[in-house]
Amino acid sequence: GVFEGTDKGAFNPTGILTREQAAKIVAVMLLGEEDANKLSTNSTTFKDVAANRWSAGYIGYCVQQGILAGTGNGNFDPEGELTGLAFAKMMLVALGYDAKVANYVGNDWAINVAADAVNAGIAPKGIVLADAMTREQAAQMAFQTLTADMVYYTNKGTTVIGSDGMQVI
């Protein structure tokens, strides 16, 4: 499934979501479990992600899709903690938002992500997006993302497709 237990077999709902766990969540949401689990790589872009690491395929997919990037100096920090803002940005990009067009890069990225996450209905009530995100909060945000509107950019502007498949804008 999208969420599995830790290597100790527990869901660990209050554990903090890591960057590599987030990559798996997004890959499974976009590709489906069967196809996401087939992702593999012979080499990686990052010094700290071995090609045989359990998450290397998910990370590679998310980087290739523009959903995730490294942390600098050729590193990814796969076990690094993720904030609610960072995960919301991933979810929004997965919904079709263009990070550059939506201004999710630069100094005001956090403000723009927070506003769009709330407007899109993917931010669970009662969480502080600037804080580290727990696994249970990530599960809730991922669920809410599954029912959110998709966004498509065309040469005529932005098109929003509702979760029911109907064009909204």
Residue ranges with predicted function:
Residues 4-56, 65-85, 92-132, 146-169:
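Feature responds to low-complexity, polar/acidic, surface-exposed segments characteristic
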